[in-house]
Amino acid sequence: MRLIQLFICIFAISSNNVKSDEYNGVVTRVIDGDSIIVKENGDLNKIRLRYIDAPELSQDYGEESKKFLQNQLLDKSVLVYTEYNDRYGRQLADIYIHNETESIYINAKMIKSGNAWVYKTYRSNSYLINLENHAKMNNKGVWSSQEPLKPWIYRKNMK
């Protein structure tokens, strides 16, 4: 079953017809709930997790989201699938952890646990949207709040 989920994730990612690059590295720092630093062959790469938007650190649930991601990734080996760099020079990427029994798609785990929203601005991803709906129904993470404020609205209000 896990193998099928992995293939579905990879298909959803690769179906965007954009050339991707992949590499292995170690997460040396978690900046917030959707940004990390990955060391690859001595280079430090700033990564923004693709398709998700986590609460800002100054926002409700921002620190919790960061801590969740730290527990998942800090000092661990990861597989990075990067598509392109954003306007801030960060690599937009899908992050995976592999262990003996499974591959874990971290972007999806952040959504499923209620630690991030699906970032629908550029593209919809039905797999992640379904995970978000499940997290909402189960009041997980940010969804435990009556009316959670979406990070992109929070940032807009802070300007």
Regions found by a protein language model. Give the residues of each.
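Small beta-barrel nucleic-acid-binding modules, primarily SNase/OB-fold domains
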Residues: 2-159
